[in-house]
């Protein structure tokens, strides 16, 4: 009996990063984030070698979409790593965090800052 060879269909993964909150507060630049991702994504060990497997685009509704098709290897952890590097480079890592909303959907949101009412009362 001949071995059965299965042909893997080319899977398409889509990662969506919602950057609406920081963009609305003029803290985050969506275009520079997309440019950073394009320049720093590694494919086959080469930085910036996206080819036809990976496309990174910015949508008008404050979302960045990373589409991986074919044999492109890309994970959510790698996207999180690159985003954290971008935030650290632009010195906004202390205020914004990268949060997973659903599978392959992420969001940049501000850290929750609890206002200390007790300190305000003590000062009065």
UniProtKB/Swiss-Prot annotation:
Any one Gene Ontology molecular-function term assigned to this protein's record: RNA binding
Statement: the UniProt record of this protein carries the keyword rRNA processing: no
GO cellular component, one term: preribosome
Subunit structure: Component of the large ribosomal subunit. Mature ribosomes consist of a small (40S) and a large (60S) subunit. The 40S subunit contains about 32 different proteins and 1 molecule of RNA (18S). The 60S subunit contains 45 different proteins and 3 molecules of RNA (25S, 5.8S and 5S).
Keywords in alphabetical order: Cytoplasm, Ribonucleoprotein, Ribosomal protein
Gene (name only): RPL22B
One Gene Ontology term from the biological process aspect of the record: cytoplasmic translation
InterPro entries: Ribosomal_eL22 (IPR002671), Ribosomal_eL22_sf (IPR038526)
Organism: Candida albicans (strain SC5314 / ATCC MYA-2876) (Yeast)
Family: Belongs to the eukaryotic ribosomal protein eL22 family.
Source domain of life: Eukaryota
Lineage: Eukaryota, Fungi, Dikarya, Ascomycota, Saccharomycotina
Name of the protein in its database record: Large ribosomal subunit protein eL22
């Amino acid at each position: 009996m001949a071995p059965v060879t299965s042909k893997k269909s080319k899977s398409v993964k889509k990662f969506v990063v919602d950057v609406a909150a920081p963009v609305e507060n003029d803290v985050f630049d969506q275009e520079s984030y997309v440019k950073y991702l394009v320049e720093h994504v590694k494919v086959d060990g080469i930085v910036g070698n996206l080819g036809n497997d990976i496309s990174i685009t910015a949508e008008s509704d404050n979302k960045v979409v990373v589409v991986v098709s074919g044999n492109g290897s890309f994970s959510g952890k790698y996207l999180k790593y690159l985003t954290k590097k971008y935030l650290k480079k632009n010195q906004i890592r202390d205020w914004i965090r990268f949060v997973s909303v659903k599978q392959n959907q992420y969001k940049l949101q501000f850290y929750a800052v609890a206002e200390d009412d007790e300190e305000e009362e003590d000062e009065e």
